[in-house]
Amino acid sequence: MLEETDLIIKKLKKETNEISDIVYREKYICGKKIYIIYNEPLTSSDKISEFIIKSLNELSKDKVKENLLKTISNNITNFKYEIIDKYDTLCFYLHRGFTIILIDGEKEAIVLETKGSIKRSISPPENENAIRGAKDAFIEDYQTNIGLIKKRIKTNDLWIDNITCGKY
């Protein structure tokens, strides 16, 4: 069983050193606080905003006759989803491109598959042939490069932070 949502958020932020890649969106639906959590380089922001956020905004008190968890999982039909009840499972899915919906007061969470696709296929570097090892090259844009790293290393211990050096 999951803990309270605020405790889960604090624990997750502490374990990931509050990196900016993991997005926490807080919303209120039918008077209940929910969190939408996703790992930005690994997910499709279009899928999240077009389908998940839009579906959640369309929920009204009239539609929520049973519990909110069941109503949300029934209304978001475009995705494969799972109901989870363990914190470790939540972290597992978060680092694999899934979006997590936590509902205040619920002991379970909804996990939706919102994996993003890389803009183009990654090809091996043409001037550096390697016999063994990874064939990826960091010649893409920033978000794609971060996504490549996070696809290979799926852990809370990988922290990526943006810093500004010098003046513009």
PLM-predicted stretches and their roles:
Residues 1-168:
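Membrane-embedded alpha-helical signal segments
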